[in-house]
Amino acid sequence: MCFRSTLSATALALALAITISSAKAHDEAKYPNWKGQWRVVLTPGLEGQRVKFDPTKPWGKGQGAPLTPEYQKVHEDSMEDQKNGGLGNYPSATCHPGGMPRMMSTGEYEYVVSSDTTYILIGGEDHYRRIFTDGRPWPATIEPTYAGYSIGRWIDEDGDGKYDVLEVETRGPFKGPRAYDGTGLPLHSDNMSVFKERFYLDKTDPNVLHNMITVIDHALTRPWTVDKTYRRNTNARPAWREFYCVEGNVNLVIGKENYFMSADGLLMPTRKEQAPPDLRYFPWVKK
């Protein structure tokens, strides 16, 4: 009797395992294949300007951002400061996280898709994004982060029973300041941007992933939309780089001034006749 009960329990457990496994396999089949390593596709001739919002245009003013007059001035001041050795409006130069949308313009990406959450693994100072697809409502309060709070939904556009598109909305408040690119192309200082994205594979090339991303921000005169594309590495076992911004970063901000750190660990000016740091807390140093 005991043997029969054990056998029955084993058979039931096996049947449940097969059922769960089959259901899981069926669920996975509904989602697009985004496995592998993805990199931003850049227009030939612009490879040296990797980190920017619109990958088809030069960075800075060449992006054609619809900035308000106030934020055009912020951008111009940023570029002028950089010409004189400063960092301008670009906090990532001192290894602060870029946040949204810069974090979608950097290195290699990996997508981990489940039924309730999609993760975008980024690495470096931006780490990852978490996109909830479990049907949750927007929370009453959102803690400020660099990546923002993202809610998405899967869409079967052609009615074949498989998902084609992931629609995502990302809200703040964000941590800041943030910039689109290395010239300090700015987002508004209120850090209340909203981002709307549509991720989908190219219909003619499954190794190309589109991210149609729209920025709604008070520094803009209208929503700004670009098609960011990523190409999948055809190597089934790609190399994944380990990158930490602080390693080898020579920028050092003291007060509101940017200095360089030399290879032998000495402080260097970044522009002609730059004043040294305030040494008021070092009274033993001769003036």
Each predicted region: which residue ranges?
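Bacterial N-terminal signal peptides that target proteins for export
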Residues: 1-11
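Compositionally biased, intrinsically disordered low-complexity segments
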Residues: 6, 21-23
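PEST-like low-complexity, intrinsically disordered acidic/proline/serine-rich tracts
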Residues: 23-287
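Bacterial N-terminal signal peptides
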Residues: 9-19
